[in-house]
Amino acid sequence: MSYFTKLPAVLLLEDGTVFQGKAAGKIGTTTGEICFNTGMTGYQEIFTDPSYFGQIMVATNAHIGNYGIADAEVESGNIQIAGLVCKNYNIAYSRKQADESIQDYFQEQNIVGISDIDTRQLVRHIRDKGAMNAIISSEILDLEELKAKLSKVPSMDGLELSSKVSTKETYTFGDEKAAYRVAVLDLGVKKNILRNFDDRDVYAKVYPAKTTYAEMEKDFAPNGYFISNGPGDPSAMPYAVETVKEILANDKPMFGICLGHQLLALANDIPTKKMFNGHRGLNHPVKNIIINHCEVTSQ
């Protein structure tokens, strides 16, 4: 599909701010916590990253969909974001490796979005006011009706979401004859993390979020443990904190990324706090505590 009629759509924020735009993806209504990602490429990886489950993603890059969708570039089996907000929503694409258009992809997976709005103004608003709930609709344009629906959406604070995106069955990834064996506690792991394990001669076994240390140790006897990235509030995951504590108590090598890193902190009685605006993008500031400098890293 190269051309289609753009129907009107509306984005309503929790604080009452309204943006009028055009429908993108499936005609419908969606809700979630609105936030922005500053990556200039990799929109498909963003859509399918389980860490973004339940969030409406604003793309700061003006063009989305212009290089299509490739099956090989997903980070999970499904689109994880609740909705998309962008400036230019491109149905046509010009990359021979692509398998389909973003419009076909969104319609197949029932994703509602909005385009043709001033995303620079919106990002500044979120930057200044912080992340908040929002609603996108291309089927309901009455603001009072949308406000009523939005008022019923729960805050992301206190939500346990990892069990919704975690694998339901244990599976392996990589070469069984690899030099190392790592047990992965899947709280929303990205496929690229598993590919990186394989590239480094690691055979990984991936377990559902609520698997205990004893179950993983008995089943796999790994050289170490990895606590994955994922969505939701770490304080709402006492089961995972307990698993991390047991791994630490048994003096097993372990590391965590994203949510897993926060759980490692909680297991050591170090509290975590939600940032006013999270760092979502390709370049992340990291404080070098040795030289007391802030360095920009590519991740």
Predicted regions and their residues:
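Cysteine-nucleophile active-site neighborhood
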Residues: 223-224, 229-298
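Short gly/pro-enriched beta-turn/loop segments at secondary-structure junctions
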Residues: 177-180, 220, 249-250
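RNA-binding accessory domains that recognize and position tRNA/RNA substrates
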Residues: 1-214, 232-234
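Short Asp/Glu-rich motifs
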Residues: 125-126, 216-217, 266, 284
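Residue-level signal for well-ordered alpha-helical positions
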Residues: 70, 196, 219, 267-270
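Short amphipathic alpha-helix with an adjacent loop that forms part of the alpha/beta core around
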Residues: 213-221
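Glycine-enriched alpha-helix->loop->beta-strand junction motifs that scaffold or abut catalytic
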Residues: 201-203, 220-224
